[in-house]
Amino acid sequence: MIRRCKAEEFDEIYEVINDAAARYEGLIPPDCWKEPYMSRQELRHEIDDGVVFWGYYEEDKLMGVMGIQPVQDVTLIRHAYVRTAKQNQGIAKKLLSRLRKESTRPILIGTWAAAVWAIRFYEKHGFKLVSPEEKDRLLRKYWSIPERQISTSVVLAEERWFEESPHSL
């Protein structure tokens, strides 16, 4: 079942994110890795900043999360994670499909350039990488992340983003 996460599920969201994010250790730049990957304070800040988490549940247990955040004229997909033991079972696909229905605006996704599996996943579902120049512009305009993260990230956009106004690939 997919539904919007409840406030009282904060600790479960935190657990899912940090369980799945362990995959980044050794892949992303060492100066960007920390344990836990996302602290409770950082998660609270993301929620307070407008990220709404949706969850995939099996028998009332949270197995995966994906956040959605309207920012200016786009919607961002944020913090998409599936418990390690449940990965490659279609959970992220189901969450992405559900969240795409929630947005009337073009969707953008930012991820680490080293997260090749994530990039392939989004490309498989119709998203395309934007040019490096456009990536830098978009990350500065729509995200609040450090310059170091901008330099080591990519942005993917869905087709309607490219169609609605002239952007460079």
Which functions belong to the PLM regions below?
Residues M1-E15:
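A short beta-loop-alpha structural element at the N-terminal edge
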Residues N18-L43:
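Conserved GNAT-fold acetyl-CoA-binding loop/helix
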Residues Q41-W54, Q149-T152:
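A short helix-loop-beta-strand connector motif used in the catalytic cores of GNAT acetyltransferases and
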Residues G55, K61-Q69, L76-Y81:
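Conserved beta-strand in the GNAT
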Residues A80-Q87, T111-A113:
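A short, internal acetyl-CoA/4′-phosphopantetheine-binding micro-motif in the GNAT/acyltransferase core
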Residues V82, N88-K101, K124:
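Conserved acetyl-CoA-binding loop-helix of GNAT-fold acetyltransferases
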Residues K93, A114-Q149:
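Conserved active-site alpha-helix within GNAT-family acetyltransferase domains
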Residues K101-A114:
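Conserved GNAT acetyl-CoA-binding A-motif
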